[in-house]
Amino acid sequence: MAIELDLQLAVEDQNGLPSAQDFQTWLDKTIPPFQPQAEVTIRIVDSQESHQLNHDYRGKDKPTNVLSFPFEAPPGMEMDLLGDLVICRQVVEQEAIEQDKPLMAHWAHMVVHGSLHLLGYDHIEDDEAEEMESLETEIMQGMGFTDPYLAEKE
């Protein structure tokens, strides 16, 4: 076992979504350098569920692209469960259009970004953001995608 994926599709229309293999590949290219074995749940949701979760857990009154919920094992308990990613289909699709990015590249970026959050990376402080964005770019380019922050740098 390397990275075990539990994929939950909580959207009515599943046409056009990345495949389970796509999600698995993106996890496999992101997590093992930091943690060789892990279990990750990816839940694809609609904007209503994303909005509710974003409100409940972050105090933000809107849907968001990806939410990361790291698993915190009780003291003394060893588990490979890394955590959950909740990705909002509508937000990802809208952002890809607005940012003029290929849709699959943006899906991959959300998995990479969320996975790094599960691994403890953050982007609250400038130096943290720089480190995290650099890792995201390196991972994305390693999978054949362009720098996800290219438009912001130009």
Curated annotation (Swiss-Prot):
* Alphabetical UniProt keywords: Cytoplasm, Endonuclease, Hydrolase, Metal-binding, Nuclease, Ribosome biogenesis, rRNA processing, Zinc
Relay the cofactor remark from the entry. Binds 1 zinc ion.
Recorded GO CC terms: cytoplasm
* Function field: Single strand-specific metallo-endoribonuclease involved in late-stage 70S ribosome quality control and in maturation of the 3' terminus of the 16S rRNA.
- Compartmental location: Cytoplasm
> What's the gene?
ybeY
Q: List positions binding Zn(2+).
A: 113, 117, 123
Q: What is this protein called?
A: Endoribonuclease YbeY
Alphabetical list of Pfam families matching this protein: YbeY
One MF term in the entry's GO annotations? RNA endonuclease activity
> EC number(s) for this protein?
3.1.-.-
